[in-house]
Amino acid sequence: MNPSHPQPKIQLNQSEDYREIYSNSVQVRVSVWDFLLVFGLVHQETPEQVNVNNALGVYLSPQQAKALWNILGQNLAQYEQTFGALALEPQPPKGPVH
């Protein structure tokens, strides 16, 4: 840390429209200028019908998308070190998805 340029203090505030949601679905859309992450919930109504209800879209610059990728990777590595490896199924499980 350079004493002539001290780090600024960061204060985190929540805006009035801040909200938290649960998501079991994310769609990623990419353009030259940005990434769009669309979070939603998957509901399987019948064996033939799966509905995805999109709840929130977040636009990120390519730089912020890469920073998110890095921090998620670090946190997933710590999670797996603590709780064990996460396995991703190549195919969705058969039967209803809740």
Identify the residue ranges that each predicted region occupies.
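N-terminal intrinsically disordered, cationic/polar leader segments
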Residues: 1-63, 70-98
